[in-house]
Regions:
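Short coil-to-beta microelement around the adenine-binding A-loop and adjacent beta1/P-loop entry
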Residues: 17-18, 70
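The feature captures the beta-strand-to-loop junction immediately N-terminal to the Walker
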Residues: 33-38
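Helix-to-loop junction immediately C-terminal to a conserved catalytic motif
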Residues: 51
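Conserved ABC transporter NBD signature motif
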Residues: 58-72
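ABC-family P-loop ATPase nucleotide-binding domains
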Residues: 82-137
Length: 148
């Protein structure tokens, strides 16, 4: 198996607080891992670095052999912990955006997952509960054929 993710000596500081201190890990393609730790231990910080959302860190992160950037984002499917849709949007708008943005997005799979969650593409984001929005976001990220 090939190395899908390699994190080497990553340190991230927020002013004087070290959120990550010399973290190293590898993940082989085809493997599933859990990232466990107490609140404030740097799990979210590490995930954001891997996704290219945080840039000011020390060390090296390689995704499929490449530095974090535009190419790595194409093979990562990320579920943020906050809603990132605009209230005026409809589900069908977001489906169209995802289809345009991600070559690996499987719209039919997304619609199947949405059906399981009892979500309709005619629904307006503003009218959805927090739980419904979370189910929709999960449907979106699970419908990409991303490597990571």
């Amino acid at each position: 198996m090939s190395e899908l993710l390699k994190v080497t000596n990553v340190t991230k500081k927020y002013h004087h607080f070290k959120a990550l201190n010399n973290v190293s890990m590898t993940l082989e393609s085809g493997k599933i891992i859990g990232l466990l730790g107490p609140n404030g231990s740097g799990k979210t910080t590490l995930i954001k670095i891997i996704n290219g959302l945080l840039k000011d860190y020390e060390g090296e992160v390689l995704v499929d052999g490449k530095n974090v950037g535009i190419d790595s984002r194409k093979i990562i499917s990320y579920l943020p912990d906050e809603n990132y849709f605009q209230d005026w949007m409809y589900i069908k708008d977001v489906l169209s955006i995802f289809s345009d943005l991600y070559e690996d997005f499987d719209k039919e799979n997304c619609l199947t997952l949405m059906n399981r969650f009892k979500l309709d593409k005619g629904m307006k984001i503003k009218e959805m509960s927090k739980g419904m929005k979370e189910k929709f976001q999960l449907s979106l990220v699970m419908s990409r054929k991303a490597k990571l």
